[in-house]
Amino acid sequence: MEDAELSESLSGTIAADAPLAKPARKYDRSIVEGPLVPAVWKIAWPAIITNLISGLQGWVDHILVGNLVGYKANAAIGVSWQIFLVVIVFISSIFIGMSVLVARYAGANEPEKVNRAVYQGFLTALFMSLGILAPIGYFCSPYLLGFLTSDPGVAAEALPYLRIMFVFSFGMLIYFMLSGALRSAGDSKTPMVLGIAMTVLNLVLNIILIRGLGPIPAFGTAGSAMGTSIASGLVGIYALWRLVRGGWVVTFPKGGYAPDWKIIKRLFKFGLPAGFQGIAMNVGGVMMLWFMGSLAQGGAAQAAYAVAYGQLFLLISWSSNALMGASAAVAGQNLGAGNPDRAKAAVNTAAMIGLSGAAFVGIFFFFFPTQLLGIFG
């Protein structure tokens, strides 16, 4: 009954829509037909490459601040990012709900409904980012940092970083939203290109803003947040322009710009369970940092945690997340196409690929820990 109501809501809104400015690309039907392993891998490998490159961006940030500012800067980024991650994971759960709808409608070959779901996800992210995350995050940052660290040097480095990330988070959220929508519709190469562009731009800006260049002063730890915000903001603006202009496999519809509460309700219904799960997992990291911050050498301990777990280990986590997104996209499209057995097999296939990759990286970490940690200063 609820699915029928949502379909009626989508169809009613779409009926008044004008044609898109530019024809959208067709969905890749090999995801719901043909061999399964190539279908999963086709979506997974660009996402893995994107996440690995994004992970290297974090490496560069920590290497620069660790060598130019000191270990307290590593701790500051680690503490700030853990706080930011708890909030961003919860908001990003909306995109999981959006991706579920996109995959189902793409599998059923209903592009108008896909585009409506994407647009409502954008509206929800816009409100939560600018209306909730930015103001509350800015004013609560000192209290959150005071809870996690007793080292005044770490807190002083972390406060401007965290405030910048909260206030200018919208570009990053737009990228996360678009990546999830495109992958769920079967296109993971476009997010890869955007992710590489954002990472390269971020690296250049961070190197300049952290250490300074010519008339540009060295901003230290805050420069890392500034570079991330500028790079993600520029990519977010470009993505919005393309969504309005058309030509991607997902676009914004013409007309029907008001919030559709039936769709938004479904976004939360599908996404909130994953959001609460993500919060529970990341709160564990927050409590670990709180305990470390209470120690006599809390700053050094938090710096070690930020590098070892927050950067090195997350290479495995980000790759796993990419495979999770790929399996969700393939499974969702096959459910939409009426292939439940193939959907279940897609999840198992992605799990086996992820297990093999994690084992390989884990062996590398086991034999070369000193060399890997040494590059962070």
Located regions from the model:
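Short membrane-interface helical motifs at transmembrane helix boundaries
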Residues: 131-163, 360-377
